[in-house]
Structures are given as structure tokens and as C-alpha cells.
UniProtKB/Swiss-Prot annotation:
This is Arginine repressor. Transmembrane segments: none annotated. Keywords: Amino-acid biosynthesis, Arginine biosynthesis, Cytoplasm, DNA-binding, Repressor, Transcription, Transcription regulation. Its main location: cytoplasm. GO terms for cellular component: cytoplasm. GO terms for biological process: L-arginine biosynthetic process; protein complex oligomerization; regulation of arginine biosynthetic process. Pathway: Amino-acid biosynthesis; L-arginine biosynthesis [regulation]. InterPro entries: Arg_repress, Arg_repress_C, Arg_repress_C_sf, Arg_repress_DNA-bd, WH-like_DNA-bd_sf, WH_DNA-bd_sf. GO terms for molecular function: arginine binding; DNA binding; DNA-binding transcription factor activity. It comes from Heliobacterium modesticaldum (strain ATCC 51547 / Ice1).
């Protein structure tokens, strides 16, 4: 069932523009599959799907093969930061990054894959990312790096 559902997900996002998990769940239901948003979310993560911009304000799900077209993780991260970040701030050892709606997970994933030594981990919502930084003295340098890449 899971492999059938994941194959269907790849077929759907390959054939049409799917912007949200709910849209994807609806397409699966139209194919007779009973799914929850949580199941779709897990499938997206397991399949390594990414969100790619289709315009300044919209993005769609894409297969990981499209991510392979970006040669380096750092290049992908720079592009994501430049194209989606709207604000950077901090509190103690946490850097907070605001993105365009729907892009926080992609940016946080790219940060995680960059293996920055000062980053302990990230937590992403729809448009907000918390980055836990250690040591606290590294916060300003990390914020400066992000701001430079955003410009």
C-alpha cells in the first residue's frame, strides 16, 4: 500500500502542479486512496520531495531528481535563502528565519544538509525556521552569513 501510494505521489507531482500537502492528499483520494495529511507529510519526507518556486509567491512539490540539478548543497542553500528569506533575527542561541509561505521546510533541510558546525539543528514550520546554535557566540556570524546570502 505504501509503495503504491508513493508511486502515485510521484506520478501526480510529475503530471500536475501540486502546491500543498492537502492538494496532494485530495489527488490521492481521487485515486481511491484514503490518506491523512500526516501520512502525506511522511511520504513527502521519505521520497525527498522538495518545493520549487513557480513564481515569487508560489511553489510546487517536485521530485528529488530536480534537486540533483543543483550541483552543490551550498549553491542550493544560497539560492533558497536569496529567493525565499524575508527576515532574520535571533534570541540567545536561536536564529529565527522567516521565509515566504511554504518554504521553511526546504530552507531548513538545505541548512541541515550543509552541515554547518555551529548548527545543532533546525525546526521548521510553514514560514518560520528556528536554528539552534552552539556556541552562543556563533549566532552573530551565522546571522551575518545568512544575511549576506540573502542579498
Amino acid at each position: 500500500m505504501k509503495s503504491r501510494r508513493q508511486r502515485a505521489i510521484l506520478e501526480i507531482i510529475g503530471a500536475e502542479v501540486v502546491r500543498t500537502q492537502e492538494e496532494l492528499a485530495q489527488r490521492l483520494r481521487e485515486r481511491g486512496m484514503e490518506v491523512t495529511q500526516a501520512t502525506v507529510s511522511r511520504d513527502i519526507k521519505e521520497l525527498g520531495l522538495i518545493k520549487v518556486p513557480v513564481s515569487k509567491d508560489e511553489s510546487r512539490y517536485a521530485p528529488p531528481a530536480e534537486a540533483a540539478q543543483v550541483p552543490q548543497a551550498q549553491d542550493r542553500l544560497r539560492r533558497l535563502l536569496r529567493d525565499t528569506v524575508t527576515h532574520v533575527d535571533s534570541s540567545l542561541n536561536i536564529v529565527v528565519i522567516r521565509t515566504l509561505p511554504g518554504h521553511a521546510h526546504a530552507v531548513a533541510g538545505a541548512i541541515d544538509h550543509s552541515h554547518w558546525p555551529e548548527v545543532l539543528g533546525t525546526v521548521a514550520g510553514d514560514d518560520t525556521i528556528f536554528i539552534v546554535v552552539k556556541p552562543v557566540e556563533a549566532v552573530e556570524a551565522l546571522m551575518d552569513k545568512v544575511r549576506r546570502w540573502v542579498e
